[in-house]
Amino acid sequence: MTAPSINFTDERLANGLRLIISEDHLAPVAAVNIWYNVGSKHEVPGKTGFAHLFEHVMFQGSGHVAKTEHMALVQAAGGTMNGTTFLDRTNYFETMPSHQLELALWLEADRMATLLSALNQENLDNQRSVVKNEKRSSYDNRPYGSWFHKLQEYVYPPDHPYHHPTIGSMEDLDAASLDDVAAFFRTYYAPNNAVLSVVGDVEPAQVRRWVERYFGEITASRTIPPLPSFAVSPIIGKETREVVEDRVPLTRHFFGFRAPVMGDPRFDALEVASQILAGGKGSRLYRRLVREDRIAQDVSFFALGLIGGASIAAGQATVVPGVDPAIVEAAFEEELDLLAREPVTDDELARARALIETYELEALQRVDERADRLSSYATLLDDPDMINRQLGRYLAVGAKEIQAVAAEVLRPDNRVVLTYVPAAQAGATTEEPAA
């Protein structure tokens, strides 16, 4: 299978909106994907959770669309839509029959231009309650639900914008006024803070006319503040451990590490290393902990790319009942140490490359994935052509690069270990080894 060359245009409207168009007439489908350069890292102390709150508010109507009708109109036209928020960004997206493309563009423009005219105290209170319920169901009351938030707190220092979770503080949301959240929207949800990608069975000239018609008169934001410094030491500088008593069925270890930023070649090497460690049943961690030693029920390891000073590498292992959790932790860490001590074999490297190549090529077959990646690379790296180069970067990673990044990242003084245990088994809190 050969990687396709994805052709696209990249331009800006007078108000700053970045428009990327990629034409593909293979199927009568079009994807619309808008990324706003706003995530939880843009929030300030005392006003957290606003970016995630708007992920909900954006579906509660705008100036010319009734409450909940954005979703209803898209579904009635045979399309799908959704939105996500994370540390670095927020995105909203539709996949439509190509003859319904104009509807999706109009809906996104109406939200950008007129959302605040439909935002009232009742809507704010309702969506605030929805977010609280989401926090209870997805984090507070879900087994192991707090693990990533705890990693954030340990991997990033308290003054770093990644230290707090995207869902935010419920106290901050309770204290937020209608004026507070409206000011946040006016600041960040503006054409000069957005990338709009349109991919699929489209005519670029017509797309430009529609985008100019619906987005062209929206006023740019003049109040986007500079971000605080993201500078952070490449390593945490100590190992941190916590035993978490929780309503969980089995003991599970989580491991976290500070890692190079997305776009750094070392991050590419870390992603390839993740496949060698935990990419399927032939990976090192699965083969040893699950298949051979039979001490873990499941294992995983992945690298999460971020652009603000440091990314996160993380893994987990669920302990088989009756096995000493210390044995599982030791085996997991031995495999990480081995990756730093000795080069991977040619067979392991070929297998990891094949897994990545298959995943990447399958993903790029879909117009919605192409639209998302174009918006992502433009927003985070200012380089949408990375869509044509990223696979080559992965395939260029060799054994030396993997060994080097493992030695740099997967080291004890850069490690967080969270051990979740069933409530009756807990017997410790936080431990930090003596220097």
State what each model feature region is.
Residues W106-R111, R209-F215, V328-E334:
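Short amphipathic alpha-helices in soluble, non-transmembrane regions
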Residues R208-I224, A340:
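Glycine-centered hinge/linker elements that transmit conformational signals in sensory
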Residues G49-S62:
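Active-site SXXK
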Residues L87-F93, N120-N133:
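Short, glycine/charge-rich beta-strand/loop segments that flank catalytic centers
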Residues M1-S40, H64-Q100, S138-N193, E217-D264, ...:
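Non-catalytic beta-strand/loop surface segments
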Residues Q60-H64, A113-E122:
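Short, polar/flexible loop-turn hinges at active-site or ligand-entry regions and domain interfaces
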Residues G39-K47:
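Short pre-active-site segment immediately N-terminal to the catalytic Zn-binding motif
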